[in-house]
Design a protein with these regions (language model features):
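Structural helix-adjacent loops and short alpha-helical linkers that scaffold large soluble proteins
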Residues: 24-42, 107-124, 166-180, 225-239
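Extended glycan-interaction surfaces of carbohydrate-active proteins
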Residues: 1-8, 53-87, 128-213, 246-287
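Leucine-rich amphipathic alpha-helices with coiled-coil/heptad-repeat character
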Residues: 24, 48, 52, 103, ...
Length: 287
């Protein structure tokens, strides 16, 4: 049975169902389904706002909570997987902005005004905070923010949830996107590495989220690039990912949980037979 701990940082995952439901609706126009799922999706957004925010309205999570178990994000002394690290988690903030925008579209269409009346202010306030406090002008990158207001130095793929929002002005977004083409960062033999290659924790075999190439985050990056007009870069990444997945399939006869960033090979301790997880994304990316 489903269960959660209201104050357990690992008990909830990324709030992505509104994204999938909206894509489903735009393709099939199922009004009955949209009417059924909207109140649940709106309620969960509000639950996260109530139970996963710091007092300034920004969001927290954890390694497990973001789905990126061992990504090196929290300060020393905190558990990488289980702790929120007294940190403002960039992807959790960006995902809530994305979701609020989607719920606004749903709410306007369904004329459910009362359930979405504060969402525009949420988007405005959270976007302003990220731009002012979580952007490094020196690095041209978005980071998590620690309790002492300093920024993390970890450059992770989670920053590219910004592509699914209007948080960054064009000049800043261009700089963020440039890192995807940088061979010292995310442009490795198999794209897109989940952790920048110049990070001390980066592993050639991926070691899960210490550089591993994951189908879900690749889909997030590619679809965001297309949405924001970076179509050439999106095409290059798609073809690279598709060809690497195909090479590994020809060698092993199966699809894998995730892949190594430095070679056409499964990632370290990756599980095989992940067809539902890794079979569709290359084809979805190609479309």
């Amino acid at each position: 049975s489903d269960c959660f701990g209201r104050y357990d940082p690992t008990s909830t995952g990324p709030n992505l169902l509104p994204w999938s439901e909206w894509l489903y609706y735009t393709q099939f126009g199922d009004d009955n389904r949209l009417n059924k799922v909207f109140p649940v999706l709106a309620a969960y957004y509000k639950w996260l706002k109530l139970n996963r925010t710091w007092r300034n309205g920004t969001y927290w999570s954890s390694g497990w909570g973001t789905g990126m178990d061992n990504m090196p994000r929290v300060p020393e002394g905190y558990n990488t997987i289980y702790s929120n690290g007294h940190t403002i988690w960039l992807d959790a903030c960006l995902q809530q902005i994305m979701v609020a925008n989607i719920l606004l579209k749903m709410g306007f269409y369904l004329e459910r005004w009362q359930e979405i009346e504060e969402f525009e202010d949420d988007i405005k306030n959270l976007s302003a905070y990220i731009n002012k406090n979580m952007w490094s002008e020196r690095d041209g990158f978005l980071y998590d923010q620690y309790a002492d207001d300093s920024l993390s130095t970890t450059q992770g793929i989670y920053a590219y949830w910004a592509l699914h929002t209007d948080v960054l002005p064009k000049q800043r977004l261009d700089r963020l996107v440039e890192h995807l083409d940088d061979t010292c960062k995310f442009n490795r033999p198999h794209r897109v590495a989940s952790l920048a290659a110049d990070n001390p924790k980066y592993k050639a075999n991926g070691r899960y989220w210490e550089g591993g190439v994951w189908p879900g985050t690749n889909y997030m990056v590619v679809s965001g690039l297309v949405e924001k007009g970076y179509r050439r870069l999106a095409h290059d990444i798609v073809m690279n990912h598709y060809n690497n997945v195909l090479k590994v399939y020809k060698k092993t006869g199966t699809f894998w949980e995730y892949y190594a960033p430095e070679d056409a090979a499964p990632g370290f301790m990756a599980r095989k037979e992940f067809v539902g997880w890794n079979g569709p994304p290359p084809n979805a990316d190609l479309k």
